[in-house]
Amino acid sequence: MAASGEQAPCSVYFCGSIRGGREDQALYARIVSRLRRYGKVLTEHVADAELEPLGEEAAGGDQFIHEQDLNWLQQADVVVAEVTQPSLGVGYELGRAVALGKPILCLFRPQSGRVLSAMIRGAADGSRFQVWDYAEGEVETMLDRYFEAYLPQKTASSSHPSA
C-alpha cells in the first residue's frame, strides 16, 4: 500500500501470445517477473507455464475472457506487449489500447527471423506507442529503461523489489 502522499503502484497489462503459440512462455515469465517491480500485472496468467497452447479456459468461455481482458485493459496504466510470436489477440489488444489512449511498449526480437507487422511497427510514434527491438538476454534492461524513462511518475514509489 502506498504511504500518504505517494502514488499507488502502476497497473500493467501484459500482452503475449496464448492461442497463437506458447513458444515464448518462459520469456513471458521473465517479463512478468520484471514488470512486478513496477506494479500490479493484471494479466500475469499469460506467463503461466500451465496455460495450454489451446489457450485459456474460463467458466464463461471466450466471451467472458474477452470482457475480463477489456476490463483489465481499461484499468491499466500502461500496456507492455511481447510481439515476436504473431498473435491475433495481441494485435486486437493493442488496437484497443491505442483507442483508450494507453501508453504502449511493444518488444520485438529480430533475431527470431520473423518480420514484425507493419500495423504494429508503423503505429510507433516515439512517445505514446513505442516499438523496441531487443535480444532475449536484454529484456529486463529494456523494461527498466522504459519504466524509468517514460513512466517515472508512476514508478517512483514502486521501483524497489519489495513492491
Curated annotation (Swiss-Prot):
Which top class of enzyme applies to this chain?
A: hydrolase
A single GO cellular-component term from the record reads: nucleus
Keywords from UniProt, A to Z, are: Acetylation, Cytoplasm, Glycosidase, Hydrolase, Nucleotide metabolism, Nucleus, Phosphoprotein
EC number(s) reported in the record: 3.2.2.-
Q: How does activity depend on pH?
A: Optimum pH is 6.0 with dGMP or dCMP as substrate.
Q: Which residues carry this modification: Phosphoserine?
A: 17, 87, 112, 117, 127, 158
Please give the record's induction comment: Up-regulated in response to c-Myc and by partial hepatectomy.
A molecular-function term among this protein's GO annotations: protein homodimerization activity
Oligomeric form and interacting partners: Monomer and homodimer.
Q: Which family does it belong to?
A: Belongs to the 2'-deoxynucleoside 5'-phosphate N-hydrolase 1 family.
Q: Which HAMAP family does this UniProt record tie to the protein? A: Nuc_phosphate_hydrolase
What protein name does the entry list? 5-hydroxymethyl-dUMP N-hydrolase
